[in-house]
């Protein structure tokens, strides 16, 4: 993938495989040490030995995958770059920030805005969705929350879908790879990166979050 930009071309006489756990490296390590699991995708780009898929699956088992599913290098790259820019990280930051800012603009306190936007989602609702599915959440919440969530979900889908379509196209046409390589190749990469992440850390929402997290009982 994107070999014209990366210059990475594998030798013709070796198996080329991948095993991609569906989580951050930190999560994979933590779950592995706890004897828990995370799912992984596996793919074969080049099978010289006739055992490439077997090796990829073995790698998935070795890192503690709950189950593995087969994909292709292309689909894995596209879905990975797309996902981390969308619902996994970029989209979360953007959605949290938008909701928080609207609450603050309408007179809600920083603590209330953060708790109603981030804390409740991350500490309570998202883990329940992970364990039981979204349909469970609709059935387990109040009738007020249920009706509102059912009504507004299509609105968010309609608003977000064009953004996700532009994002996927940017991944597919190589724009995201190009931008990443250019940014990561700068002599000032670390300084520039720190400036961007420091700006996020300095947003009121996440400054409030730092305080809220410190007040959790399990932090004491």
PLM region spans:
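NAD(P)-dependent Rossmann-like dehydrogenase/reductase catalytic/cofactor-binding core
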Residues: 36-39, 43, 47-51, 55, ...
């Amino acid at each position: 993938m994107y070999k014209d930009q990366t210059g990475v071309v594998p030798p013709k006489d070796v198996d080329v495989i991948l095993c991609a756990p569906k989580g951050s490296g930190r999560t994979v390590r933590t779950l592995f040490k706890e004897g828990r699991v995370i799912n992984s995708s596996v793919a074969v780009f080049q099978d010289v030995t006739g055992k490439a898929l077997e090796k990829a699956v073995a790698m998935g088992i070795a890192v503690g995958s709950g189950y593995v599913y087969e994909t292709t290098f292309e689909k894995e790259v596209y879905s990975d770059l797309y996902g981390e820019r969308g619902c996994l990280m970029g989209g979360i930051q953007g959605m949290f920030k938008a909701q928080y800012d609207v609450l603050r603009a309408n007179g809600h306190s920083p603590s209330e805005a953060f708790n109603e936007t981030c804390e409740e989602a991350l500490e309570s609702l998202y883990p329940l969705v992970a364990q039981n599915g979204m349909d469970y959440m609709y059935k387990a919440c109040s009738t007020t929350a249920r009706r509102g969530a059912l009504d507004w979900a299509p609105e968010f889908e309609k608003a977000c879908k064009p953004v996700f379509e532009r994002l996927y196209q940017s991944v597919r046409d190589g724009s995201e790879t190009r931008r990443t390589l250019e940014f990561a190749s700068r002599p000032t990469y670390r300084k520039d990166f720190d400036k961007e992440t420091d700006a996020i850390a300095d947003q009121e929402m996440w400054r409030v979050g730092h305080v809220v997290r410190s007040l959790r009982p399990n932090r004491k």
